[in-house]
Amino acid sequence: FWVSGYTYTQYTRGEKLVDLHFTPKFTMTDAERMDMQAQIDETVSQILAGIDAQAPDYDKAKYVFDYLASNVAYSTGAPDNQNIISVFVNGETVCQGYAAATQYLLEKLDIPCAVVAGTADGQSHAWNLVKLDGEYYYIDTTWGNATYSGDGMGLDSFINYNYFAVTTGELQKTHQPNDDIIVPVCQAVKDNYYVHENLYFDTWDADSIGNVYRAAYEQGDGFCSVRFADRELYEQAFTYFITDQKIVHYCKGLTSLYYLEDSDQNVLTIKF
């Protein structure tokens, strides 16, 4: 966070490169850096106190994702938004800050994590590549903060898990890493949020799906998201629960119906 870039000098003999010197561009003095690091360390210690260092990889990754998505505001005007100061000191950031903070916290928890730069929906973006239980996945913490979409549906308490531990194929529906970045192909699904939480359906079973929504409604959850294996199942669920309003058969007393669609990831979210 105390370096904004670098300059370099090439030394050649004839046409042969013999040496290369890099000089960082510092953004603060050493004393300022130490003071800022102390502030960051204090916040990070408070955050990590909420998770057992011996917890399973999935639990650690979800804890970090949940914390950042819930407690750090998305703001394009946030100061220092290209580094972790924006997150741990100011509490507001953009995609680069979310990705850098996710990496910082996960590496503190001994989970390998890298920041990936590229585009999402055609706009410059940053997210993470993580290794959970020996397998690689993608995580986009920025998109976990549902207010990022700015659709004004009262989403302050909602966490969007549609890009928590996804495969390369799922990611590439909306995200594209820069061409100069070499990343592994992510194929594992065990630690995907919907698979891990039993919210993933690959066959149509109205009652089983409806009972998932019912359980969330009856225990007072504000939202419930279910993911389907393909577009056909997703559209079948949308028609059944939303168009035909069969959700009221499972959620007794529900007087209004609000929902979120994600046809890219085949996720149907109902707000209670």
Positions of predicted regions on the chain:
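Conserved hydrophobic/aromatic pocket- or pore-lining residues that grip, position, or stack substrates
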Residues: 64, 68, 95, 106
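Short, well-ordered strand-loop elements centered on a beta-strand within folded domains, enriched
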Residues: 17-22, 86, 90, 135-141
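N-terminal accessory/pre-domain segments preceding catalytic cores
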Residues: 1-55, 170-272
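Catalytic cysteine-centered active-site loop
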Residues: 75-85, 92, 113-123
